[in-house]
């Protein structure tokens, strides 16, 4: 079982077969950030700390994401797979064994529950 949430789903799109270089999620159903839910600003806010472990008066804001994840995932799954954005729904979690994807961090609890069901009960499909 391979699970990824939020922008980490990108790793699945870029993991490739050595021979034909197709994505390992080709033909699979996945979810991730839809264009409607991409951050417009505020990606990468981080409190920075000095060598004395005290907060510094600075942080990092990279603005919007560096890439539109929806388009990357749509291309990676190909014509026989499907991207499910879950727009308008609080949660968007897809299990297409061996891949379990959650659109964002609010999917974490459900992703964890589905991990248990997949590993202990043999669940192979959920969310579409």
Q: What residue spans do the PLM features occupy?
A:
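Active-site-adjacent pocket-lining segments in enzyme domains
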Residues: 1-3, 7-128
